[in-house]
Amino acid sequence: MTTQPRKILVTCALPYANGAIHLGHMLEHIQADIWVRFQRMRGNKIHFVCADDAHGTPIMLNADKLGITPEELIAKAKADHIRDFAGFNISFDNYHSTHSEENKQLTAEIYNKLKANGFIKSKVISQLFDPEKNMFLPDRFVKGTCPKCKAEDQYGDNCEVCASTYSPMDLINPRSAVSGTTPIVKESEHFFFDLPAFEGMLKEWTRSGSLQSEIANKMQEWFESGLQQWDISRDAPYFGFEIPGAKDKFFYVWLDAPIGYMASFKNLCNREGIDFNEFWAEGSDAELYHFIGKDIVYFHSLFWPAMLEGSGYRKPTNVFAHGYVTVDGAKMSKSRGTFIQASTYLNHIDPECLRYYYAAKLNDRIEDLDFNLDDFVQRVNTDIVNKLVNLASRNAGFIAKRFESKLADKLEDESLFAEFTAQAEQIAAYYESREYNKAIREIMALTDKANKYIDEKAPWVIAKEEGKEAELQAVCSMGIELFRVLMSYLKPVLPKLAERAEAFLQAELRWDNIHQPLLGHTLAPFKALFSRLEKKQIDAVVEETKALFAAANKAAEKTEAKPTALSAVEPIAETITIDDFAKLDMRVAKVLKCEAVPESNKLLRFELDLGDHTRQVFSGIKAAYNKPEELEGRFVIMVANLAPRKMKFGVSEGMILSAGTGGSDLFLLSADNGVTAGMQVK
C-alpha cells in the first residue's frame, strides 16, 4: 500500500526589518530548514516560507534618523536578510515582506471578518502624546521613574528593578524617548480584538495533545490569569496599514505580522499556481507548522489561532518553540564580540559547521542552546573531518588507484550494511520529532562503527600483500558504502557537503535508496570534501564583531549627546525612622524553581520556599540571569509582607532583593551558609 505524500506548510518567525540577522536568528532557521529538507527527502509535498516583519514605530523612527524613507530602510533590510539566509543554505521557497499588497489585502479581509462577526470592539483610551513630534508614544518610547520603587529611567510598561507593571501615565516625571520632551495626555479611540471570546476554543486546542508541554502549561497559566482584550490599533503617524474606515488609525504591527505568513504563501501561490485554500481553508487536511522563539509564544498560541478561528481560517497544526542562544554560557554580548551577526560569521567560517553544531544540540524542548566556541571547533573537527570525511578519503584513494574508481560487485559484510540501513526509520523518527541531537548521536555511533571496521580490516596492510586485490577492493568499497549511508542520513543537516559527496559518488543521496548499495559502480575522482575549522577563524569572527560594534558606538557618539555618567554610588535616600524600617518583614527564601517568563523581556518567575509555605514571585532580573534554572536551590532575601501584586503573568507575592543599576547589572542578595528557609532578616 502506497502512502500519500503529506501536504505541509512551514514558516519561521519573521525577522524584524530594523536590524541584522545574527546567530540567535539562525538557530530557528537552521532548525526549521533541517526539518523541511528531511520532509523533502521523504517525498512529502512541503512549502517553506518566511518574510520580513516590516512595520512599526521603530522602523519609522530609524528611517527618519537615517534620512531615508521607511520603504528604503526595509528594502535594504530584506536584501541583507535574504543574502544571509542564503549564505546558511536556508532553502525557503519564498521570502517576502509584510509590507506587501498580499498582506494588505489579507489583513483587511481578516479584520473585516472579525468585525462582522462581532469580535472587534472600540473604546476611548488615554495615552501619552509627544507634542514636539506630534505623535502618540508606545509604552517602550516613554521613560521615567517607577511609581512603585522609585527607580529612575524605567520603561513605560514595567520596571526592570522591582518588576512592577503599570500604565505609562503612572510614571513619575515621564519623558519621551523620541524627543526628550515631557509628554501630555490625550484621548484617542482604539480598536480591540475580543480575545476572551475564544477562551473555550483555545482551552480545547491546548488539550489536543499536539502542543509542546511547556506551551500547554504556560497557556494554562494565562487562562488562570484571565485573557484580556487586545489593542490592535495605533494612531498616526505610524508605518503600517491603515485600518479600513478609520481615519489616521493603523493596524498594530503584531496584527499584520502573523498574517504575513499567509501573505508570503499567497505570493508563492500566485507565482507557481498553488491552491492557497488547500492549505489555509477551514477544514484543510494540510499540515501547518510555525517555528518560533520562546519569547513570542504568547502571540502565536493565543492571538493568532483566535484570529484565524474568528475569520474562518484553519488553525496551526502545531507551534514549535525553541530557546535562546547563549555563547560560552553567557548572553550574547556586543562588547565581548559574541553578539555575532550572520554576515560576520560567513566572512570566516563554513556555514555547515554551525548547522552541524546546532543540530548536535537541538532537541524538541524549549531549552536555551549554548554555543561554546572551544567545543564548536573540537566537535566539528572530530565528527565531520576526522570521522565522517576521513572515512571516504581513506578508502577512495585505493579504489581510484588500484581499481579504476570502480566499487566491488558485492558487499564485503552484508550484516554490517544491514545494521546501518536498519537505523533509517529510527533516525527518521528523530528528525520528525525535531530531536536532532538524538539523530546526530545515532549517526556518529554508526560512524565510529564504520571507522572501527576499516581499522580492523586495515586496507593499507592488505594493499601491500600480493593476491589480495579482491579483498582490498571489497573492504574499501564497504567503507565507501557506509559513508554513502551516513551522508544520506546527514543530508538535511549538511546539504552542501552532501552535494559534494553526491558528485564524488556519482549518485543521488535519497532516503528511499539508502538500502540499495552501489555495486559495481564507478566513482568520480575524490576531492577534499571539508576543511578543518581553526581557532584563528573563531578569533577573527570575535574580533570583527567587536570592531563592528565599536565603530557603531563611535558613530552614535558623534550624532547623539553623550548621557550623563552614573555616579559610582547612588545617593542615599531620605532618612526613615526605626519604626518605618520595622514595618518590613524580610525573610530568607529557598528557590525551588526559577524560569523565564517567555512573553516578557525582563521577568523571571520564582517559586520560593519560606519554611512553612511556598510563594510565587516575579522579579525583573532576566537580563542578569540568562540561565534561571541555575538559581534553583539557592537562598535569596525577600520582602515577605509586601502586598501581593496582580501582574499580567500572575500574582507576585513579595519582592526579591538585588543590588545594581538595573538591566544586566543586577546581583541577587544572599546569606551565609547555615541559613534555612523562612528565617527573618534582622
Swiss-Prot record:
Localization per record: Cytoplasm
Record note on cofactor: Binds 1 zinc ion per subunit.
Cofactor requirements of the protein: Zn(2+)
Binding site for Zn(2+): C146, C149, C159, C162
Span of the annotated motif 'KMSKS' region: 331-335
Sequence motif 'HIGH' region, location on chain: 15-25
Gene Ontology cellular-component terms listed: cytosol
Domain of life: Bacteria
InterPro entries the record matches: aa-tRNA-synth_I_CS, Anticodon_Met, Met-tRNA-synth_bsu_C, Met-tRNA_ligase_1, Met-tRNA_synth, Methionyl/Leucyl_tRNA_Synth, MetRS_core, MetRS_Zn
Chief place where the protein resides: cytoplasm
Protein name from the UniProt record: Methionine--tRNA ligase
Organism of this sequence: Haemophilus influenzae (strain PittGG)
